Amino acid sequence: MSVSAAVAAASTSRTLVLARHRSPPASRVAATSRGRPFSSGPHPLAVSPATRAPAMATDGAAAAAAAGSKKKKEVLIFDAEEDLAVSLAKYTAELSAKLAAERGAFTVVLSGGSLIKNIRKLAEPPYLDSVDWSKWHVFWVDERVVPKDHEDSNYKLALDGFLSKVPIPTGQVYAINDALSAEGAADDYETCLKQLVKNGVIAMSQSTGFPRFDVMLLGMGPDGHIASLFPGHPLVNENKKWVTYIKDSPKPPPERITFTFPVINSSAYVAMVVTGAGKAGAVQKALSDKQTSSDLLPVEMAVLQDGEFTWFTDKPAVSMLQNK
């Protein structure tokens, strides 16, 4: 899907499933994972009936663009971040089992920020022992061009909070070459991805011609940015490169590399993990029916061509939504 098509689809295709998650006891969480195959429908932890937000009407070219995004965006709302973390771990572990069995590899894309804290349950029982970590291949949706041991490094954040606690083979964790310039690091990372597509580690989307990662675990900034794709920045319109670079990030540090929207939108699964009242305004705009293509936030441009998009949120993050 081109970026322009993604913009049109984001502004016209607004069917959502809103599911409120009560705080289930640990015994119930464990029970939901037994005797139930992985489902691409509502997540097994949805313990109350889902409601549907009305979809906007579509017409003409906008409807044609939206046709590339027929999958609903499911919005899961948790009473507490702890319950969100439990459900996110289960979601990821089930995808790992399903897709590793199908493909022989499981490609996971991480973001920085609070996402690493949100996936902490994967490094605890039962997942620490039950997940086949040897099949995992880990990438970053964006990275700051700083040394790997720098406090701003997304690699360091993930290493300290997650990767050092699980037995993923070192050679299957793909950090950037921090000795290169931003442009050089972006080109080098894209070259790495193309080689992994050639080797069959990363799938290729037959519909878009871009790499198809198994799952992206993403966060969102208070301004609605995802990856290092910021509101109003020209990079949101990049539609040829897989990985590009930015030297004038509005959020420090200024030099970064980032996946482009065609890569993000070719994913098989995306979990958008957003917590806290500070992001409620962006969540409200992203999930509102009242949109125009001229004022989309980057998070609204994440429209999967042929995949499943799930929001993992807590009550403060959706506090400005009317139908929460």
Curated annotation (Swiss-Prot):
GO biological process: carbohydrate metabolic process; pentose-phosphate shunt, oxidative branch
Gene3D superfamilies: 3.40.50.1360
GO molecular function: 6-phosphogluconolactonase activity
Transit peptide: 1-63
SUPFAM superfamilies assigned to the protein according to its UniProt record, in alphabetical order: NagB/RpiA/CoA transferase-like
Renumbered residue ranges of the record's region Disordered: 19-43
Record field: catalytic activity: 6-phospho-D-glucono-1,5-lactone + H2O = 6-phospho-D-gluconate + H(+)
Alphabetical UniProt keywords: Chloroplast, Hydrolase, Plastid, Transit peptide
Top EC category: hydrolase
Subcellular location: Plastid, Chloroplast
EC number: 3.1.1.31
Xref: InterPro entries: 6-phosphogluconolactonase_DevB (IPR005900), Glc/Gal-6P_isomerase (IPR006148), NagB/RpiA_transferase-like (IPR037171), PGLS (IPR039104)
Gene Ontology cellular component terms for the protein in this record: chloroplast; cytosol
Pathway linked to the protein: Carbohydrate degradation; pentose phosphate pathway; D-ribulose 5-phosphate from D-glucose 6-phosphate (oxidative stage): step 2/3
Ranges in a coiled coil: none
Described function: Hydrolysis of 6-phosphogluconolactone to 6-phosphogluconate.
PANTHER family: 6-PHOSPHOGLUCONOLACTONASE (PTHR11054), 6-PHOSPHOGLUCONOLACTONASE 3, CHLOROPLASTIC (PTHR11054:SF22)
Family that this chain belongs to: Belongs to the glucosamine/galactosamine-6-phosphate isomerase family. 6-phosphogluconolactonase subfamily.
Matching NCBIfam families: pgl (TIGR01198)
Protein's recorded name: Probable 6-phosphogluconolactonase 4, chloroplastic
